[in-house]
Amino acid sequence: MNPLRVIVKEEELDFAAAAAAAAAGEGSPSSWAVGVMDLPRPMEGLGEAGPPPFLCKTYEVVDDPGTDTVISWGFAGNSFVVWDANAFAAVLLPRYFKHSNFSSFVRQLNTYGFRKVDPDRWEFANEGFLRGKKELLKTIKRRRPPPSSPPSSSSSSSSSQHQQQPAAACLEVGQFGRDGVVNRLQRDKSVLIAEVVKLRQEQQTTRAQMQAMEERISAAEQKQQQMTVFLARAMKNPGFLQMLVDRQAGQHGARNRVLEDALSKKRRRPIEYLLTRNGETCAAGESAAMLAADGVAEPDGDTTPRGDGGGGGGGDTESFWMQLLSLGLEEKQREDGVAGGVQESNSGGADVDNDEEDDDDDVDVLVQSIYHLSPK
């Protein structure tokens, strides 16, 4: 006979006797309660299913401080981040999951309701996957594929509730990480504003440069058109060229006459003084010799004595005329003034005929006119 069965029977008899005695009032209720408490009971959670092995292994690898450089908990502790996906797939996946496919790991996370929190990095979260609360892993259930047949109203309501549960988890994660997201967006906004300001300044500078270039191009085109019109008129109408020559000669003649009058007034007094010195009259050559001997100063303050040259045809006289004719003229007409001074001095000393001009003078006038129309 099995002794265990006998013991059970004895316990049952003792329990029955104690219950009968308690009912008759012979035994105390405390003894009957002690007998009830001594009965064997099953362990708590013995029949409940534990969390899936995938979740347990994922929790272990995330909670391991030695792998924080590759994978670790998020800032709020309600998510985990894979910092180095290549190292995670090459080292940790073969160690814990017997494969090295990171995409397969991500798909398996999706089947358990994990959602990606940050689109810029591998950060996943679930409402039952929290730091320091491993017992909540049993609340994470694997999602079942939707049935192929059209579901009834009750099944559709249950499936909608099941689909809304991960969304609530994502909302919860968003509430925890809202401050970080706002700070990152503010930094991105400030960077974009600085770039926009810089591009706007560069645009304004480029626009100003383009306007200045357009003005220079328009001015050059206008001068080119004027030069083309001038050349066309000069080629078609020879009288137009002669008119320009006469006008320029008249302008130079007027300036030369003014300078000649001023020079004659300045030189008249020394010459008259020499001619009437000591109450005697002398010839032009003798007066020049006396002027050189006495060292009479020139009108412009030059004390250099003049050489002999009846009519003022010497080299010093020519340079003196050239300096006087060049005074007051603009820089672009300096060559014309010098040429006019030389021509005036030659006409006063050697009586050269000013009416004899050759073809070279016409060419010079044409070149000077083109020079005045050319861009500076």
Curated annotation (Swiss-Prot):
Gene Ontology terms: biological process: cellular response to heat; regulation of transcription by RNA polymerase II
GO cellular component terms, semicolon-separated: cytoplasm; nucleus
Compartments, record wording: Cytoplasm; Nucleus
Start-end of Acidic residues biased regions: 352-362
PROSITE patterns, per database record: HSF_DOMAIN
Induction record: Not induced by heat stress.
Domain note: The hydrophobic-rich region (HR-A/B) corresponds to the oligomerization domain. AHA motifs are transcriptional activator elements.
Quaternary state and interactors: Homotrimer.
Main function: Transcriptional regulator that specifically binds DNA of heat shock promoter elements (HSE).
Name the UniProt record assigns to this protein: Heat stress transcription factor A-2a
Gene it is expressed from: HSFA2A
